[in-house]
Amino acid sequence: MRLTAQVINEAPEILNPEGKLTLLLRDLQITELENLAITQNKYQVIDLSNNDLISLGNIPKRFNNLQCLLLSNNNISYIDDESFPSDNHITSITLFNNNIYQFQKSFKDKFPKLETLILLGNPITEMENYRYFIIWLIPSLKVLDFKKVKQAERKTSEDMFGTNRDEFNSLAQQMFKNENTEIKLDGKSDRQVKNFVKKMTDEERQQLLKKLETATSIEEIERIENDLKEGAV
């Protein structure tokens, strides 16, 4: 389905638990982001979960009200460098269960204010030193994959990749070479919590997915993380 002006204008809007105005565009089989400018920078959260997006782009420039993108359960494999502006004010992105399989050098420029990032369920998380490299690329991060970024992790990342983020040392360069590696990109249904909650029932998995898709604060993320450690949903 195309994300037309009519679809956007007819989409429901809610106040989320944090009181942030949220545009609900989930479950519409949307394949490409477009026409978001007609929202006139009104929304703090845009929920695009459970669609068929293959890239993250076409975010209007000067959308300084937009703080959170919920993008779980799509087929996103890359950030569109040309149409994803660097002057955004986004602090939280949930990309749970997508197809991101390689690092992009633009990560360090595209997320200047990003504090919370969820990439679980993406092939990239299986790469060696994945967590350290993401922390190095996006130093503003406070929470990555439901875990607080620790000062010791920041130090380790700088020990590995250097303190100058304008230069990529040999190890950093190696992290970008995943494009030549043959990786199986699963469909959404195959990826869903495949390696994350293997012992949970189908009903529990759906509850977990719902929580992942709507978590927008550090407090929520910490609570979900504790639940997972204790085996609760």
UniProtKB/Swiss-Prot annotation:
Q: Where are the LRR repeats?
A: 20-40, 42-63, 65-86, 89-110
> Residue ranges of the LRRCT domain?
122-160
The highest taxon in the source lineage is Eukaryota
GO molecular function, a single term: U2 snRNA binding
Q: Name one Pfam family in it.
A: LRR_9
What are the GO cellular component annotations? Prp19 complex; U2 snRNP; U2-type prespliceosome
Keywords for this protein: Leucine-rich repeat, mRNA processing, mRNA splicing, Nucleus, Repeat, Spliceosome
Subcellular locations according to the entry: Nucleus
**UniProt entry tagged with the keyword Mitochondrion:** no
Q: What is its main location?
A: nucleus
What InterPro entries does the record point to? Leu-rich_rpt, LRR_dom_sf, RU2A
Alphabetically, which GO biological process terms does the record hold?
A: mRNA splicing, via spliceosome
Q: What does this protein do?
A: Involved in pre-mRNA splicing.
Subunit record text: Associated with the spliceosome.
- Please give the family membership noted in the entry: Belongs to the U2 small nuclear ribonucleoprotein A family.
Designated name of the protein: U2 small nuclear ribonucleoprotein A'
Q: Which organism is it from?
A: Candida albicans (strain SC5314 / ATCC MYA-2876) (Yeast)
